[in-house]
Amino acid sequence: MHSPGFQYRLYYPRYISGYEKVKMYTTNQTNTMETGPHTKGIVIFGATGDLCKKKLIPALHKLWEKDLLPENFVITGSARRDPGVTVWKESLGEYPDEFMNHLDYISTDLDSVESLRHLPDYLEDNTYFLSVPPERYENAIVNLKEAGKLEDPERSRVVIEKPFGYDYKSAHHLQSVVERYLREKQVYRIDHYLGKDTVNNILATRFSNILLEPLWNRTYIEEVQIFATETIGCDGRAQYYETAGAVRDMLQNHILQVLALVAMEAPCKMSAREIRREKTKVLAATRLGEDMIFGQYQGYRDEEGVDPNSRTPTSVAGTLFVDNWRWEGVPFRVLTGKKMPYGCVEVVIKLKAPPLKLYDGEINDRIVIRLQPNPHLDIRMDIKSPGLDDNLELATLTHDYPQDRAVDGYEKLLYDAINCDQSHFVHADEVMESWRIVDDLLCTGEKCKIRTVPYIYIGGGWGPQHKVDRITDWDYPA
């Protein structure tokens, strides 16, 4: 035991500030007083992979440029392979030396408790980012806990990439592991759509404007259409896509999260707890319709890593219903897929026609929220054309969302995780309700409740269009 007033040195590695830094601690009879600031850090597992190089490090660099990272913030890359810190840094690309001085690398194995004990212990607040295959999540959480890295729920957290589970059963199992070793406040489940400014703007548009809220219900809305389409195919990801398909890749997460934001009730305050509670309530009231259509683009089965007899859907179209007071009877149409004519994420709110038709050529009013690309908000309505007759023409009020101030999804999500804000992360209950909704679509046997055998479609169309067009009169994006 040191005597009162004894001073000892704690060495910080040079990459915190570019040189070896010493912090002095002074003891007294009752406590240990630290004279320097707390140090935060993020440990990225899977740091030799593409996600780290292409998304995470660029996002952290942008936060650093904006002076939004703590002064002594440390970014530690980690993976089983050990290229060495110099080679790893060089593999990331060109960044200023001042930023690179915050980076370090240590080789660890998520399957080994002893290996994880070698992670830095000089950091007092840690965010652990699991940029690893989903099948490694369970061992990672268990072993990080056993290694003593997650003991303080106020100063340690785990960021988990999608997918959280493969179906309802596997998600339930993974959640049981999470509950056993972590508190929910320590778990940050990423859906990168929730980091997009334009997606977050859905709530701002709805709840900060009295103009729209009185119309936002079954009395005035005929249907809602949600598009998440791509012009590309699997683009080298066929092996992954073969195990995921359009349901797991898009519908279970991104599309249902957008639906929840469009359909949820106003939270009593803009906190993580209240926002996620309202989203969960909407998802709990959501069910599939009976007109779900699967498609698979022609040539998919010829791609490397794909079963020649694959039934994996590359497109899904159909209807969901939200069985609550606000939305009873209003169909939510969804369309997602690859190799389609136009790539975008868009929400179309189609309003009902007036009770009495006084003019010829009336078109239902629409509110269109384009999330990407070229994000904007449109309000489309009929007005009288200039002239002597009573012809109508479409008028569009458009607000283009300014992109010069927009932030990348991972930039927003990393900033929130580091600062312990779960507002834009997915709660366990949301995950389980989402899997419940789509679970019937994952059936591959002969006794499936819904036909899950995909119709083959030629790239450049809206999936198997002869089937898709029977669902509704789509407002296809352009």
Each predicted region: which residue ranges?
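N-terminal amphipathic/basic-hydrophobic helices that include classical n-h-c signal peptides
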Residues: 1-30
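Secretory/organelle targeting and membrane-embedding segments
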Residues: 25-159, 164-478
